[in-house]
């Protein structure tokens, strides 16, 4: 699949990457649309201290579920989805009081993990 990859600050390439396989409890999304925002620009320019490189940016994206991992109902296949890029643990204190945005294990797609500027995520 083709992906937009920030190799390091100010160095962007379109790269061929392997098709991701969904893990247990996960789905794979065939990306239809992805938006770009200031956060992506900051990662490109090297102004986001949390970004790790190389990185597929894009945390605002929409698509269709085309594969499911173990434990996910096959009825999800074909569903259109808008992706919430913030992944929280659900168990730490901030998560337990309804503040998953400050989870102690917070992961953001397009920042800590590859995001939506690919054909699949």
Where are these regions (language model features)?
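NAD(P)H dinucleotide-binding glycine-rich loop of Rossmann-like/cofactor-binding domains
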Residues: 89-121
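Residue-level recognition of beta-strand termini and adjacent short loop/turns
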Residues: 8-10, 23
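Glycine-rich beta-strand-centered segment in the early N-terminal region that forms part
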Residues: 20-34, 47-93
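Cytochrome P450 core scaffold surrounding the K-helix E-X-X-R motif
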Residues: 39-45
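Short Gly/Pro-enriched turn/cap motifs at secondary-structure boundaries
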Residues: 7, 18-19, 52-58, 109-113
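Short N-terminal binding/cap micro-motifs at the start of the first secondary-structure element
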Residues: 11-14, 38-39
């Amino acid at each position: 699949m083709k992906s937009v990859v920030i190799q390091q600050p100010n160095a962007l390439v379109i790269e061929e990457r392997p098709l991701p396989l969904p893990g247990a409890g996960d789905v794979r999304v065939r990306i239809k649309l992805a938006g770009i925002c200031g956060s992506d620009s900051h990662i490109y320019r090297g102004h986001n201290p949390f970004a790790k490189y190389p990185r597929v940016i894009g945390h605002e994206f929409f698509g269709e579920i085309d594969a499911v991992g173990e434990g996910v109902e096959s009825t999800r296949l074909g569903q259109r989805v808008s992706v919430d890029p913030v992944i929280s643990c659900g168990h730490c204190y901030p998560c337990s009081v309804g503040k998953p945005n400050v989870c102690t294990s917070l992961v953001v797609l397009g920042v800590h993990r590859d995001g939506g500027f690919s054909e699949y995520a």
